[in-house]
């Protein structure tokens, strides 16, 4: 039976972990290295860092954060945010990341996915997609890809499912799908979106956006078909521990790595 992964997500801004609702109203959640070490000790299967700092002047801070984190944790670390070139990817991998996550830059330069996969291997390339439901009531479900998610998200006109298919064809080895409608709202994943993606993806899919309880993660796996489930708020602010989630899943027959 395939073991499902539990992944805490750390949004890093100017060297601190923050968390907002639908990308806004950020609350400070602590030091990234300290949080990463705590999640490592608590039994997390992987960690994701997203650098949401707007200023390129502060990008060096993220490299330092990754270096310090890699020295403290012994689980896979994915880093995304502001990676616009193969050199950017190399810099993060050299600092200690195991995988890099591409989002906005890949939309504007899809060949970046292929270039990264050729240089580092598909297993290193995660395509992260921020998707928003755009169908009118009564219409078949449809989601659009947005970039620059934050205070000023930009619609791309790209259909999320078609973009994910293309990203996989270009060499992405994993998909992280984030529902913009659910992000930070703690109402559960967009299961319809998740199902649409897992139905067409030959590579692992990570569910993101909307977790409020272990049951939401259970539904993401059992109903949505996710290979891994990502969460931020419920972990950062002490609502649930990684152990709480794994215990809940294991009691309901989901295979997880216990510590």
From Swiss-Prot:
Swiss-Prot/TrEMBL keywords: Amino-acid biosynthesis, Cytoplasm, Histidine biosynthesis, Lyase
CDD domains in alphabetical order: HisF
Reaction(s) catalysed (UniProt annotation): 5-[(5-phospho-1-deoxy-D-ribulos-1-ylimino)methylamino]-1-(5-phospho-beta-D-ribosyl)imidazole-4-carboxamide + L-glutamine = D-erythro-1-(imidazol-4-yl)glycerol 3-phosphate + 5-amino-1-(5-phospho-beta-D-ribosyl)imidazole-4-carboxamide + L-glutamate + H(+)
One GO CC term on file: cytoplasm
Gene3D superfamilies named among the record's database cross-references: Aldolase class I
EC number(s) from the headed UniProt entry: 4.3.2.10
Main location: cytoplasm
Residues of the active site: 11, 130
UniProt pathway: Amino-acid biosynthesis; L-histidine biosynthesis; L-histidine from 5-phospho-alpha-D-ribose 1-diphosphate: step 5/9
Places the protein is found: Cytoplasm
Gene Ontology terms for molecular function: imidazoleglycerol-phosphate synthase activity; lyase activity
Domain of life assignment: Bacteria
GO biological process, one term: L-histidine biosynthetic process
Pfam families, per database record: His_biosynth (PF00977)
Family: Belongs to the HisA/HisF family.
Task of the protein: IGPS catalyzes the conversion of PRFAR and glutamine to IGP, AICAR and glutamate. The HisF subunit catalyzes the cyclization activity that produces IGP and AICAR from PRFAR using the ammonia provided by the HisH subunit.
Complexes and interactors: Heterodimer of HisH and HisF.
Protein name: Imidazole glycerol phosphate synthase subunit HisF
Organism this protein belongs to: Chloroflexus aurantiacus (strain ATCC 29366 / DSM 635 / J-10-fl)
Gene: hisF
